[in-house]
């Protein structure tokens, strides 16, 4: 049975809520407010205690007789058959029945008061002897008066009683008529009219007759056993036995007879008899015309027309029947189950794939983007990801591994869009298709373009002087000597086979821009000139430049410089380069070697001719100038007077002043163009390097540029590129490979080659380390590749090369400077430092075999540069230093570097002073005196590096 609120019960009892709350407190039930709910036993106790305390004053008004609303007299009922033949239709025990003549259903309103006073003391002893077996209640139940029958015929206010079987409507089956057999003594077993919450209807007679607590016809009274059942009216049912809505028939319909269980009877002819009532309730009588009989008592009968045990639906005089909420059939439950979606992890419902559904997402996408692809709720994906061990927000950028795990759980195949495809889709959204443009071009549209040449080599081998010598041959420029305005790229004209040919040169000192462009996929170089000094031969940076060019698959022309210098040996250079797969034509190879002297200007024409011959023989250099310009940014800088200045190389089309361009994340309109001499240009054809003014920001080296239809389109493309790069950066999470990552990837079959970059302090150590690593027996499944080795400190070029080829840098007694270390940390390149060759070999071998153990991590504290060395007979040499980065802490481990080579290791800061005061640490920018104990090999310019060694758990 449902709970009832205090204010509803107060309105039903005719008192205010405060009175009910006070009564509840007296009964030991502490309720907070009038809106609180109370249980059914408490309601019953409250109803029993209220009439006893108030003497019916509170309920006198509702019980007042209303002759105007009196029901019609019920027709005479047939003589009552023996009790043993009671029908299965249960008869509810209603209000006390009037025992007057049948023709007087409405009695005078005067008798209720005196008869009530006379009947109250007789109820427990005379009519309810079986009530002694019931547990004691707070107060005796008041006996209903016989003269109040007319008052019971009023209709209750709709919706007031939550326990009534029919809210606000009279029960069908007609009103109870006068009972034959004369008056019967009143009993206390019947509830007070309008106060019983368990009656089928409040304040009105029960349909089909009423059962009272008096003796039943043909029986021995309420105290005796009921026919057909063994229950007696002594034990009160529990609140869980409260019934639902009565299952009586509609008025005028014949009641179906049937054999009931305990307390039930069988139906009579024409109109079924009600079931025998518990608690002394007399069986109801069916009215003529098939009106159903009243419901049964405590042991109420089963539903009419159905045999079997009597249910608990007839508790407290309520007719037995089907509950209000019918139980669903198996078919209905099955249909609901089939219509439901199968819940995913955590009880959330998300669309699931069939294991082959491909979902393409961009780099750095968020859960919201993935939810849009599969039409799911992003919050549900957060829950699924949480159960997979990953915590992420809806808008957080995720890496590819997280999306793959999520897709595998939901039945989707995740495909991460490559940067090239992402760029293609981005431009396609603006109706720009570069591939379609290239495919639509015919041979008639293509014209020859100048080759783009990059000059590389050792910085001391005359590369800059060679560029100046080539620059001086530019007769069109009309100047001889140095470069007026060096922009990193320029174009010269030479005469080749009686034709004027142009050659574009890119100046990449340190070949940093070349590596950056190759890392971003901007391979704009057609030919590389490798400059080697004839006296020095092949140097470490020469090999480094050679590795860069070979990795980019660029034809190489070797320029042997300084041939006029004493001790020059060009043949030695050709022999040395043969070891690096550069075989000269004189030795039967295909690489052109040209002897030049940049100082004297000899061999320059032969070098340019060799470049043009290589371009004509090995390359097809053609482009379409009759379209919008496409190209790449070579370099850019921010000028105070002119703003962002970008040097761009046009690869196809023609760039004109006034075009709207977008270069990477920068965009703008071309306000002016200049050549390498500072002259204004109105247009730039393919392979022409120019300086462009008018961009909103500075593009990066290697960013591609194109001409957009208008400024608005250029701005939108730049904004979308910026958003995509920012999301990809957030999702990157240092995904560069390390030794631990390689071990895990090797177990999953994702990596079969380990790339290494070896750097050492001496060539012998590097060669020994390389030979030992290449001799490792790790099986045929794994390949160890050393892409570069050299002597000297770890440089920015080493980091760039490792970034491109996803390699690991191994430093043997060498360290990077602060700028290179920051670059490696930013790019996620793993750099390992060793001082014992066997430790390096063991780590690499264990990585290949998947047997890495926990390691110790070295954390750099700071560096200091030695400005002056003070010699002391007592303390040894003291390094007067200035802290360049971090801090210098007394007692910390230290090493001494000279020209990026470790000359002293396993040292410690023995003493630290500042202005003659002993201090524990000195921070960045301050000067101090540093003592390294017994180590005295200090010189001006040395770098003292301090660090801590911490134990680091390897990723499992």
From Swiss-Prot:
Q: Which residues does the annotation say bind GTP?
A: 457-464, 507-511, 561-564
Question: Which ranges are annotated Basic residues under compositional bias?
Answer: 324-333
Regions of compositional bias (Pro residues) in chain numbering: 64-95
Q: Where is this region: G2?
A: 482-486
Q: InterPro entries per the record?
A: EF-G-like_DII, IF2_II, IF2_N, P-loop_NTPase, Small_GTP-bd, T_Tr_GTP-bd_dom, TF_IF2_bacterial-like, TIF_IF2
Q: Where is this region: G1?
A: 457-464
Give positions of region: G3. 507-510
Function as written in the Swiss-Prot or TrEMBL entry: One of the essential components for the initiation of protein synthesis. Protects formylmethionyl-tRNA from spontaneous hydrolysis and promotes its binding to the 30S ribosomal subunits. Also involved in the hydrolysis of GTP during the formation of the 70S ribosomal complex.
In the record, the note on similarity to other proteins reads: Belongs to the TRAFAC class translation factor GTPase superfamily. Classic translation factor GTPase family. IF-2 subfamily.
The protein's name: Translation initiation factor IF-2
- Specify the species: Beutenbergia cavernae (strain ATCC BAA-8 / DSM 12333 / CCUG 43141 / JCM 11478 / NBRC 16432 / NCIMB 13614 / HKI 0122)
């Amino acid at each position: 049975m449902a709970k009832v609120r205090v204010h509803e019960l107060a309105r039903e009892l005719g008192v205010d809520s405060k009175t009910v709350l006070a009564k509840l407190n007296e009964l030991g039930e502490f309720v907070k407010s009038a809106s609180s709910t109370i249980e059914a036993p408490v309601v019953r106790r409250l109803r029993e205690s209220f009439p006893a305390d108030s003497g019916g004053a509170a309920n006198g008004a509702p019980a007042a007789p209303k002759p105007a609303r009196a029901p019609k007299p019920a027709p005479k009922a047939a003589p009552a058959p023996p009790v043993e033949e009671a029908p299965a239709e249960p008869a509810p025990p209603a209000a006390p029945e009037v025992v007057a003549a049948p023709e007087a259903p409405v009695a005078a309103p005067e008798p209720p008061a005196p008869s009530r006073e006379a009947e109250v003391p007789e109820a427990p002893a005379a009519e309810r002897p079986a009530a002694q077996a019931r547990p004691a209640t707070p107060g005796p139940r008041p006996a209903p008066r016989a003269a109040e029958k007319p008052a019971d015929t009023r209709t209750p206010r709709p919706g007031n009683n939550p326990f009534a079987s029919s809210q606000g409507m009279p029960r069908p089956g007609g009103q109870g008529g006068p009972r034959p057999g004369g008056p019967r003594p009143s009993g206390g077993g019947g509830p007070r009219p309008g106060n019983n919450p368990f009656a089928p209807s409040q304040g009105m007679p029960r349909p089909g007759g009423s059962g009272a607590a008096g003796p039943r016809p043909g029986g021995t009274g309420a105290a005796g056993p009921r026919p057909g059942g063994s229950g007696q009216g002594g034990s009160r049912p529990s609140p869980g036995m409260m019934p639902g809505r009565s299952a009586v028939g509609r008025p005028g319909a014949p009641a179906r007879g049937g054999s009931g269980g305990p307390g039930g009877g069988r139906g009579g002819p024409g109109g079924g008899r009600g079931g025998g009532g518990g608690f002394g309730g007399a069986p109801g009588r069916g009215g003529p015309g098939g009106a159903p009989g009243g419901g049964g008592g405590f042991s109420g009968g089963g539903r009419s027309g159905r045999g079997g045990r009597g249910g608990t639906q007839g508790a407290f005089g309520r007719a037995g029947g089907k509950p209000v909420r019918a139980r669903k059939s198996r078919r209905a439950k099955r249909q609901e189950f089939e219509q439901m979606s199968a819940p995913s992890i955590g009880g959330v419902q998300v669309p699931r794939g069939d294991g082959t559904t491909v979902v393409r997402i961009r780099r750095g996408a968020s859960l919201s983007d993935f939810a849009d692809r599969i039409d799911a709720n992003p919050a549900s994906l957060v829950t699924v990801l949480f159960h997979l061990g990953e915590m992420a927000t809806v808008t957080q950028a995720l890496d590819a591994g997280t999306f793959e795990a999520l897709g595998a759980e939901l039945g989707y195949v995740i495909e991460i869009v490559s940067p090239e495809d992402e760029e293609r889709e981005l431009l396609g959204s603006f109706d720009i298709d570069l591939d379609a443009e290239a495919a639509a071009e015919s041979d008639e549209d293509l014209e020859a373009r100048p080759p783009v040449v990059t000059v590389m080599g050792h910085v001391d081998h005359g590369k800059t002087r060679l560029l100046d010598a080539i620059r001086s041959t530019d007769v069109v420029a009309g100047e001889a000597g140095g470069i007026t305005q060096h922009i990193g790229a320029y174009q010269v004209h030479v005469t080749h086979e009686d034709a004027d040919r142009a050659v574009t040169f890119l100046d990449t000192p340190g070949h940093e821009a070349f590596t950056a462009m190759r890392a971003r996929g901007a391979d704009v170089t057609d030919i590389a000139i490798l400059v080697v000094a004839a006296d020095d031969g092949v140097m470490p940076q020469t090999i480094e430049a050679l590795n860069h060019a070979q990795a980019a698959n660029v034809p190489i022309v070797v320029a042997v410089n300084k041939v006029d210098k004493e001790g020059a040996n060009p043949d030695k250079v050709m022999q040395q380069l043969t070891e690096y797969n550069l075989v000269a034509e004189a030795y039967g190879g295909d690489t052109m070697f040209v002897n030049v002297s940049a100082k004297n200007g000899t061999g320059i024409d032969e070098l340019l001719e060799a470049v043009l011959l290589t371009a004509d023989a090995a390359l097809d250099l053609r482009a379409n100038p009759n379209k919008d310009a496409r190209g790449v940014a070579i370099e850019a800088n921010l000028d105070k007077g002119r703003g962002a200045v970008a040097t761009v190389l046009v690869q196809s089309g023609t760039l004109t002043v006034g075009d709207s361009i977008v270069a990477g994340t920068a965009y703008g309109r071309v306000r002016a163009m200049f050549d390498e001499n500072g002259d204004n240009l109105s247009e730039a054809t393919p392979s022409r390097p120019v300086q462009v003014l008018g961009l909103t920001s500075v593009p990066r080296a290697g960013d591609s540029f194109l001409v957009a239809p208008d400024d608005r389109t250029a701005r939108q493309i730049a904004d979308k590129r910026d958003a995509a790069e920012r999301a990809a950066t957030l999702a990157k999470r240092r995904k560069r490979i390390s030794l631990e990552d390689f071990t895990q990837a090797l177990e999953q079959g994702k990596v079969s080659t380990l790339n290494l970059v070896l750097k050492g302090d001496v060539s012998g150590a590097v060669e020994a380390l390389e030979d030992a690593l290449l001799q490792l027996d790790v099986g045929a499944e794994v390949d160890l590749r050393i892409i570069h080795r050299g002597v000297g400190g770890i440089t920015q070029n080493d980091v760039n090369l490792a970034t491109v080829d996803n390699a690991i840098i191994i430093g043997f007694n060498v360290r990077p400077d602060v700028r290179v270390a920051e670059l490696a940390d930013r790019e996620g390149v793993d750099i390992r430092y060793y001082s014992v060759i066997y430790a390096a070999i063991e780590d690499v071998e264990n990585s290949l075999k998947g047997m890495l153990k926990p390691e110790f991590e070295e954390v750099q504290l700071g560096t200091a540069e030695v400005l002056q060395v003070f010699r002391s007979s007592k303390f040894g040499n003291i390094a007067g230093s200035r802290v360049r980065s971090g801090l210098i802490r007394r007692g910390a481990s230290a090493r001494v570097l000279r020209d990026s080579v470790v000359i002293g290791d396993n040292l410690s800061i023995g003493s630290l002073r500042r202005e003659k005061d002993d201090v524990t640490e000195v921070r960045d920018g301050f000067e101090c005196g540093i003592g390294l104990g017994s180590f005295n090999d200090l010189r001006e310019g040395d770098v003292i590096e301090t660090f801590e060694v911490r134990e680091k758990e390897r990723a499992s």
